[in-house]
Every structure is written in structure tokens, then in C-alpha cells.
Regions:
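Conserved N-terminal alpha-helix of the aminotransferase class I/II PLP-enzyme fold
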Residues: 34-77, 101
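Conserved beta-loop-alpha segment that forms the PLP phosphate-binding cup at the N-terminus of a helix
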Residues: 70-94, 108-109
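Active-site pre-lysine segment of PLP-dependent enzymes
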Residues: 162-175, 186-206, 210, 214
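Short beta-strand-to-turn element immediately C-terminal to the catalytic PLP-Schiff-base lysine
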Residues: 201, 222-226
């Protein structure tokens, strides 16, 4: 019987190429010795729950990088960012427009805030995967139900399908409501000419990204970026 650390070490030394998260792909990137920098909330190192110093500065640099007004670091992956964004944007027992292929965290938020959802169904592509959500779908749904307080979609999806965020954001804003984008698989967007632009710069009001999915970051690390979001 092997111990967990032994199994992990053996896997790390194997010739298996990891087509899975996290995005660092087990590459030996330069990084300080882990135990030497593992601390708690001590003087000079701020508090993530109420950042005022070095963590606040780091989050502001991330906000500048992604093009948002505010950015908050998360340590429970994208899930808590999705929960926080939906709970902040929609009052309890309110109404929300959600893509039917949303992550289960969206449904968790609906349950927590006792929300009623109208659903957007993405078209199924010829490959058998769920495709885009279109601005026209959003427009039609919002005209039908003016009580909806926010729109939440996933872009890119697990399969890499990207919706027209700019068009959807414009529609949502015409109706005076925010667009929340679960971009957990899109933390790399906007970096390099071959990638599409990130959802923040395309007009979304709250964007949740998982750095550990597509970038060289540790598991569970994620930021949520806000431009204009209020309940």
C-alpha cells in the first residue's frame, strides 16, 4: 500500500503528459520552497478577507491586467466567485436569466438565494456538443420577462465554445441589468494575438476565471473581476 505523497511523486516523475488541470502541466517552474513561505495573517502580509495592503495591491495589479475596476482573489476555485456574483447581483427570490449548460455552482446560487430562473438553451453543434448563447436569445428572453435582474452564461465552455460576449453585454445593459460570465476556462483569453479578448474587456460586469485551469497556477486559485455590479 502506497501513501498519497508517494503516489503523487511517482505520477509526477512518469512520462504521462497531463491533458488535465492544473495549467502548469507539472512543469518545474521557478518557485520559492513551499514550506518557507507558508504563513498565516501576520503583520505586513495583509488579510485576504479584508485586504488593505500588499494583497490589495496585488489584486489591483490583476484588475489592471484584466481590465476591470476590481479583482478579488479566491481560494476555493471559481465556485465561490459564481456564488458571490449571483448573490450580489440578484436580490433574494428574484429572477435571473441563465444558460442551461451552466456549472452546478450557478444552480447552487439559485438555491441559496431562492431565485427563479429562465433558461437559455445553447444550440447543439454537428459535433454533438453544446454551442453558443446568442444576443438574440438574450434579447428575446428579456423582452418576455422584464423582471429578470441579471444574465449569467458560460464562455468559454468546457469544450472551448465562446459566445458573443460583447453583443450579449450590450443587450443586457440596454435592459439595465448586469452580465455575469463564468469564464473559468478562459483565464488565458486576451493574452496573445491568437486568443479572443477576455470577457471583462468585452463589456461583462462580473467575470469569474480559474487561473489553475489554463495558466500555470496552483489548484483552486481563481480571481473574480468586477466592472460595474450592484444588487
Amino acid at each position: 500500500m502506497r501513501y498519497l505523497d508517494q503516489a503523487l511523486e511517482a505520477y509526477g516523475k512518469s512520462d504521462v503528459y497531463p491533458f488535465h488541470m492544473p495549467g502548469h502541466k507539472r512543469n518545474p517552474l521557478p518557485f520559492p520552497e513551499v514550506y518557507g513561505i507558508d504563513i498565516t495573517e501576520i503583520d505586513g502580509f495583509d488579510n485576504l478577507h479584508h485586504a488593505e495592503g500588499i494583497l490589495k495591491e496585488a489584486q489591483q495589479r490583476a484588475a489592471d491586467l484584466y481590465g476591470s475596476a476590481h479583482c478579488y482573489y479566491l481560494v476555493n476555485g471559481s465556485t465561490c466567485g459564481i456564488l458571490a456574483s449571483i448573490c450580489a447581483a440578484v436580490k433574494k427570490r428574484g429572477r435571473i436569466l441563465a444558460a442551461r449548460n451552466s456549472h452546478k455552482a450557478v444552480y447552487h446560487a439559485l438555491f441559496l438565494s431562492e431565485l427563479t430562473a429562465e433558461y437559455l438553451y445553447p444550440a447543439v453543434t454537428e459535433c454533438g456538443i453544446q454551442g453558443q448563447i446568442t444576443p438574440r436569445q438574450v434579447e428575446d428572453a428579456l423582452k418576455k420577462d422584464p423582471e429578470i435582474s441579471a444574465v449569467v452564461i458560460t464562455s468559454p465552455t468546457y469544450e472551448g465554445v465562446i459566445s458573443d460576449i460583447e453583443g450579449i453585454a450590450k443587450v443586457a445593459h440596454v435592459h439595465g441589468i448586469p452580465l455575469i460570465v463564468d469564464s473559468a476556462h478562459g483565464a488565458h483569453l486576451g493574452f496573445g494575438g491568437e486568443f479572443p479578448q477576455n470577457a471583462v474587456r468585452l463589456g461583462a460586469d462580473a467575470v469569474i476565471e480559474s487561473l489553475h485551469k489554463t495558466l500555470p497556477s496552483f489548484t483552486q486559485t481563481a480571481p473574480v473581476s468586477y466592472t460595474h455590479l450592484r444588487a
